[in-house]
């Protein structure tokens, strides 16, 4: 037999766990979902965008068709979610919405082009990607968002607030392994989004030495010694171009990678890991996907039209509040009516009436001016119990008396249930005709069944 199974303590929920650090709680968290028509490419694009937002996003979030936006909004406060990205696939176009939870504003973009991460990586010669790159938030780079329009400032602020801010005085340079670029083109009004991995390489070394430091050494079959490989640059890859001097920086900290020391020059290289997005800002709404339209790219309205729309929105809001109030009152009234009906049915089942004899007597006295007769309004004795109360000794039945063990074990008085006699030989009882017994024959003289020998012989 197996031993006793060990009982492990249950893992408790987040409410019972130790409190999270303030850096994680205050960091902007996000939900990225997709709605609309089913499309496998949109699902992959949603997963790739979640990859960009890591680690402060729900990477394994599973949304269903029955889920609504308000379901995610109701959970946002519990999980410290500040932003939500929504990819919506329609029959004619793909849109991307960025919502600031829980009260807005909401930015709606039209997606002109997109490329999945797997396609971008397959096109690159060097695939510089590692799971350790996604343990920290990326660096956000904004380009050309310094325009006159307020919508540009709001758009730039929204993109920056989607990622945690970086304190230059306390940041660890080794944790910056990725960067996200948002570039705005004022001529076409398009926003280009790119995602890169960051690689830091020491400067001032020959190509051969750099390869030895990195640990990627080519075929040395033609070399007699390592010195031949170092002194001759012909063995290095010709496809590698020289580093641009603009990418050279002096490191303020020593990195874990080989050759990157403090106060030494290093070169920063970017490798695109995808996805790519080309989108255009269409609309900015004040509320959570509703409310006043602050900016629209296609429709331009005058101040009078805006004021009319504000009044219309305010009117609809008041009507909605009034309907909610009326619904709450109707619900309370219906509950009260049901409760009264239930109580009246209970009183009717108990044989009671709503009228009280004392009240009837008072009413008679006020109307007639005389005392009513005693027999007119009789006070019936009210019983609070449906059944009469029983005494203490009558609540339970008396127990049966136990048989004496001597009488129980006496074999002489006991009858054997297997000791059977033929029912035709019994004289103590008058035999009757049994229609089920085919061997018996009825005799009308003595009114008793006789045994038929012919049938018994035939059966043999």
From Swiss-Prot:
Sequence ranges assigned to domain Brix in this UniProt record: 28-290
Sequence ranges of Basic and acidic residues compositional bias: 323-355, 401-446
Family: Belongs to the PPAN family.
Name of the encoding gene: ppan
GO cellular component, as recorded: preribosome, large subunit precursor
Tissues expressing the protein: Ubiquitous.
Protein name according to UniProt: Protein Peter pan
Residue numbers spanned by region Disordered: 315-460
Keyword Cell cycle: no
Positions bearing Phosphoserine: 237, 239, 355
Entry function: Required for initiation of larval growth and normal mitotic growth but is not absolutely required for general biosynthesis or DNA replication. Required for progression of normal oogenesis and maturation of some imaginal tissues into adult structures.
Sections of the chain in a coiled coil: 295-350
Record carries keyword Phosphoprotein: yes
Residues the record lists as Phosphothreonine modifications: 353
Residue ranges with Basic residues bias: 447-460
GO molecular function: rRNA binding
């Amino acid at each position: 037999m197996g031993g006793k199974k060990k009982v492990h303590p249950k893992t408790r929920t987040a409410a019972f766990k130790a409190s999270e650090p303030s850096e994680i709680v205050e960091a902007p968290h996000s939900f990225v979902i997709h709605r609309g028509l089913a499309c496998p490419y949109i699902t992959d694009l949603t997963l790739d965008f979640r990859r960009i937002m890591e680690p402060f996003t729900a990477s394994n979030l599973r949304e269903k068709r029955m889920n609504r936006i308000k379901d995610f909004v109701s959970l946002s406060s519990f999980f410290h979610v500040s932003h939500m990205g929504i990819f919506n696939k329609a029959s004619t176009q793909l849109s991307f919405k960025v919502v600031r939870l829980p009260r807005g504003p909401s930015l709606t973009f039209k997606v002109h082009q997109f490329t999945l991460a797997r396609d971008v990586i397959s096109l690159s010669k060097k695939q510089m990607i590692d799971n350790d790159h996604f343990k920290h938030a990326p660096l956000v780079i904004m380009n050309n968002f310094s325009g006159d329009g307020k919508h540009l400032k709001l758009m730039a602020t929204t993109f920056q607030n989607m990622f945690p801010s970086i304190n230059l005085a306390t940041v660890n340079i080794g944790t910056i392994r990725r960067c996200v670029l948002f570039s705005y083109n004022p001529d076409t009004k398009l926003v280009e989004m790119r995602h890169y991995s960051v690689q830091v390489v020491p400067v001032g070394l020959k190509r051969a030495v750099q390869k030895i430091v990195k640990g990627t050494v080519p075929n040395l079959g033609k070399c007699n010694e390592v010195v031949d490989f170092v002194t001759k640059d012909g063995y290095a890859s010709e496809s590698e171009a020289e580093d641009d001097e603009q990418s050279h920086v002096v490191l303020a900290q020593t990195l874990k990678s080989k050759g990157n020391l403090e106060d030494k020059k290093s070169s920063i290289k970017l490798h695109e890991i995808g996805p790519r997005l080309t989108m255009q800002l269409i609309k900015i709404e004040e509320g959570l996907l509703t409310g006043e339209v602050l900016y629209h790219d296609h429709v331009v309205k005058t101040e009078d039209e805006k004021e009319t729309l504000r009044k219309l929105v305010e009117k609809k809001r008041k009507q909605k509040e009034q309907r909610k109030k009326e619904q709450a009152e109707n619900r309370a009234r219906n509950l009260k009516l049901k409760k009264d009906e239930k109580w009246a049915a209970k009183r009717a089942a108990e044989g009671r009436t709503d009228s009280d004899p004392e009240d009837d007597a008072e009413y008679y006295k006020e109307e007639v001016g005389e005392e009513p007769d005693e027999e007119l309004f009789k006070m019936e004795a009210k019983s609070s119990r449906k059944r009469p109360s029983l005494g203490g000794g009558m609540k339970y039945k008396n127990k049966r008396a136990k048989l004496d063990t001597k009488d129980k074990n006496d074999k002489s008085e006991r009858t054997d249930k297997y000791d059977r006699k033929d029912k035709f030989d019994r004289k103590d009882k008058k035999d009757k005709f049994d229609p089920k017994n085919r061997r018996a024959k009825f005799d009308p003289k003595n009114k008793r069944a006789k045994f038929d020998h012919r049938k018994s012989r035939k059966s043999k």
